[in-house]
Amino acid sequence: MKKITSILLLAVMLIFSLSACGMGKPKIEDYEWKMRTIAHVEGEQLVYDAAAEESTAHPEAKIIEMTLVAKDGKITITDVTNGKTYEGSYSVSGRNPKGTDYNITIDGKSGYAGVAMTTYADGSEEPTLPISLDGYSMYFYAE
């Protein structure tokens, strides 16, 4: 009887641990995202666009407000500053112990994205979404 109880307990623990795999890893669909910074090259100069709260870190940056929502394979980026909306799709390209990687296409342009927890020097963490698309490096954080 002890042997059967031990085997059942081991099986329950195994099932629980396997079902927990993947939990805690942020995914693109889990959040509404807000843009923190965008970097791109104009001529030979690196140009930053930034959210208002980043203006002290990037005083030369053009201030813009941009949001991103992803659901069911569809992605929408809204530039609140100019009223433009950009739409596209995303698919999982890989998973790793810390998060999920994606192939994305927005307005016909292909790129890459990744979602993971970023840990800061003070030990705090937040979900982040860096995107590389058509010469632009965009950095979003969970709202």
Please tell me what each predicted stretch does:
Residues K2-M23:
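Sec-dependent N-terminal signal peptides of Gram-positive bacterial secreted proteins and lipoproteins
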Residues C21-G43:
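N-terminal helix-cap/turn-to-beta initiation motif at the start of protein domains
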Residues P26-K34, A52-E54, K71-T76, P97-N103, ...:
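Short, hydrophobic/aromatic-rich segments at coil-to-beta transitions
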Residues T37-H40, I77-T81, I131-D134:
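Beta-turn initiation residues at beta-strand->coil junctions
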Residues Q45-P97:
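N-terminal glycine/threonine-rich, aromatic-flanked beta-hairpin/loop signature
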Residues A51-H58, G94-Y120:
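An anionic, turn-rich surface loop/hairpin at beta-sheet edges
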Residues T81-G83, D107-Y112, L133-S137:
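Glycine-centered tight beta-turn/hairpin loop motif at sheet-sheet or coil-to-beta transitions
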Residues T85-N96, P130-E143:
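Edge beta-strand at a domain terminus
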